[in-house]
Amino acid sequence: MTILTEMFTATPSLSGFSAATKILLAVGAQTPTRDFLLAQKTREMLMQHLAHLWQMHPGMLIVTPTTPNAGWPIGGGDLKNGVSDANTSVRTMTFVWLANFTGCPAVSIPVGLVKGGDGKAPVGLMAMGEWGDEEELMEWGREGEEWAWGEGRMERPENWVDVLGLAKGDV
């Protein structure tokens, strides 16, 4: 609700947005002031609690699954037409909402592949860090990916492209 309301108030025109995004922003426009203020109080309380935890445990990363479910197969028209599955979207945000709501930096890494549909679907871990501590998160993510893609673990899909390597000119 908070993000939708903030997005709506910062958007001068809805032209250029998809129909689904326009609907979400319209929902944000209908948020009662009372609910918005209660959400801000909740955010402040959560941020104070997290700040206390980091004061007690400097450098702590909060690690959770990225989502409570593995990725799902891409359907025939999904890439062309998109997908609108609100239940799955909400379910996949089970663990990421705290970082989103409190503005904490977070990074997700792949840690495995499970059977799903015609192939394999990714599963991941997410780490959330203290505000301003992005370097530690990036190091955790780099080490985690090196481990995940290490010898005998996960294999990259045939269509995988190393975009960072391409950008650096390493590929």
What are these model-derived regions, one by one?
Residues 39-42, 91, 136-143:
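Short amphipathic alpha-helical coupling segments at ligand-binding clamshell hinges
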Residues 76, 87, 122-129, 133:
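Conserved C-terminal structural/oligomerization subdomain of aldehyde/semialdehyde dehydrogenase
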Residues 85-110:
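Small-aliphatic-rich amphipathic alpha-helix that forms the alpha element of a beta-alpha
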Residues 70-73, 115-117, 134-135:
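Flexible loop/turn segments at secondary-structure boundaries
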Residues 137-171:
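Short, gly/Ser/Thr-rich active-site loops of penicillin-recognizing serine hydrolases
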Residues 38, 57, 71-93:
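Short, surface-exposed loop/helix-turn segments at secondary-structure junctions
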Residues 76-79, 105, 114:
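Short, glycine/charged-enriched secondary-structure capping and boundary segments
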Residues 1-51, 60, 65, 108-124:
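Short helix-loop capping/hinge segments that flank enzyme active sites or metal/cofactor-binding pockets
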